[in-house]
Amino acid sequence: GPVSKVISVSSESELAEKFGAPDNNTFKYFLVAASFLKYGNALKVVRAASGHVNATADGNGQLIKNDDDYDDNYADGSLSVGNWVAKYPGVIGNSLKVSLITQGISDFSGWAYSGSFDAAPGTSEYASDLGKTSANDEMHIAVIDEDGVISGTPNTVLETFAFVSQAADAKKSDGTSNYYKEVVNSQS
């Protein structure tokens, strides 16, 4: 869950949903909070975290504490830690893997996650409507539980984002953004 942000919790199940089930490292904190919730239904929780950021491919991690921290400091794309970063630090975020395919990658059927999508990416309706019929701006994104920490089964596909666009101004037919960064950030 988020770090350095006050979160209201009204039940033990909501506590587990927002901050994860207890494990060997968190059970003593979780059980105190759960005990409080047996007698009341209005607990305010603030998660603390160390500054250790070690779950990266290149060794240069970035600690993003919560949505506000991301929006205020990183939403402009100034991170230099890679293409993707988990919304919250910890074991759950460390288990996430992101895989994507663009129209330019010719072997859609050979992509490990092609079965999660109806068809290969191509040119979006938005680009076509602008006369860019060969823009090939679409991509598919799969978010995977690589270690099985979230789902219990390694390599489980958790989320898919089909036919999102690489064009920053791309819109869906309902007028909402279809730009892949905005879609993933708002829906994941």
Model-derived features: where do they sit?
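Surface-exposed assembly/interface segments
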Residues: G1-S188
